[in-house]
Amino acid sequence: MSLKKKISYSEDVSGSEKANELLKWLQAYIPGKDSNIVVEHEPSKDAAKELIRGDYRWGHQDDDKSKAFQLKYSFLESKPDNMPWHISEFSAFNEAQKAAAKLSIQSWADVANINFVETTDAKEANVTFGFFDVSLTGSYAFAYLPTPEKTQVGTWYNAKSRTFLNNDIDVNGYGRQTFTHEIGHTLGLQHPADYNASDKVSPTYKNSATYFEDSRAYTVMSYFGEKNTGQDFKGIYSSAPLLNDISAIQAVYGANNTIRADDTVYGFNSNTDRDFYTAKDENSKLLFTAWDTGGNDTFDFSGFTQDQRINLNEASFSDVGGLKGNVSIARGVTIENAIGGSGNDVLIGNDAANTLKGGAGDDIIYGGLGADNLWGGEGNDTFVYLSAKESPPLERDWIHDFVSGKDKIDVSLFDLGEAGKGGVKFVREFTGEVGEAVLRYNTVDKVNDFAINLGGEFSYDDFWVKIVGEPILESDFILS
């Protein structure tokens, strides 16, 4: 689901410490907005399109993308007659290497409308896999791009390279990333710009990238580390297509619109059956872009102890499990729920009806648009609101575990419009003035009602949030 409504919020950091911290994280990883990012290249207007600029593909541009495109692949068992001239001394994949390559193939099939079929007959395969020991050009790995006229392309890997000698093919390993990268080439994806490992001068982000998003935070097809665009993966590599890879491959072949159509959990308690989406313990390292097609879905990062920043908006990046910008959400995808860990987390909702649970720690909870259900968990938590649109009377948020004297509701940056220069202030009854706030307690339901009037008679355009539990006090609020 794309964001249909946008929240406008002030960039004037005159709010509370927590509200200003939220603003910082709403702008995280956005070039020109995030002060921690050095922008060496201008952002692309369509970075995904850059990956398919050569229009390399299987089939034709006008093929029906609603029908899955079938590709056969094979692991070579002997030296082929058409082995590239600059490599020699063929060797076959062992079973562990085959299994890793199949996981990379599966990761592309998960996001694109492509049906991969394995065949033992190499001659009928569209994509082949093989190793070599010697390269006249010093190649580590390479693959050939497809065209509508071709019937077969090969992917080749240097068996004597440190990556494969060390068998670094597990999830987050460089070998696994290499398989995913080279398979991307066989499907028609290029490097983000016109550089290659065979260039006389080794490519660098500064000298070879032509736009900001050319990093391994955005695409497995890049040569350049994620730190160039502000992220930090602490030495691990993506095992699956990332944000711009997914958009690019779907533009060519269409999307896989049936995968993960039910309620899906990513992270701890994952039901994805994908290792790169799964956290097993507090030492797990996650690196992925979530592609999801339906259901009521959850980012469960409850087992991590570090301070996390979890953003549920499409095309956004989250800091999870001690890494920076390591989790993102594909364009057009809605993840409804998030569960934080035991650190001091920031949870940011989208325009769906989110369920956000902070867990232990002093968390910042921001539901955004939609009728949200919010839990701070243990610790001193702050629920921030920036606009009446985030909890109008007909789509009210519910805060379920507020503890008076510990937790806070922060409206210090609440947008009251041009007429609300006086800020939010408590009154006994609404009189129609902008910024008037009323706090009521229902002793029967044990629910607090907090409302803000934007002017005139209180109506569906105003603000109303429900707070479950014991009576709360005006001192539990941070006003503008």
From Swiss-Prot:
Binding site for Ca(2+) 1: R260, D263, D292, G294, D297
Chief subcellular location: secreted
Hemolysin-type calcium-binding repeat spans: 339-356, 357-374
Keywords: Calcium, Hydrolase, Metal-binding, Metalloprotease, Protease, Repeat, Secreted, Zinc
Active site (catalytic residues): E182
Keyword Cytoplasm: no
Biological-process GO terms, alphabetical: collagen catabolic process; extracellular matrix organization; proteolysis
Keyword Hydrolase: yes
Protein name: Serralysin
Annotated positions binding Zn(2+): H181, H185, H191
Gene source species: Photorhabdus laumondii subsp. laumondii (strain DSM 15139 / CIP 105565 / TT01)
Cofactor: record remark: Binds 1 zinc ion per subunit.
Cofactor(s) needed by this chain: Zn(2+); Ca(2+)
EC number of the protein: 3.4.24.40
Gene (name only): prtA
Family annotation (SMART domains): ZnMc (SM00235)
Binding site for Ca(2+) 2: G295, D297, T334, E336
InterPro entries, per the entry: Hemolysin-typ_Ca-bd_CS, Hemolysn_Ca-bd, MetalloPept_cat_dom_sf, Pept_M10B, Peptidase_M10B_C, Peptidase_Metallo, Serralysin-like, Serralysin-like_metalloprot_C
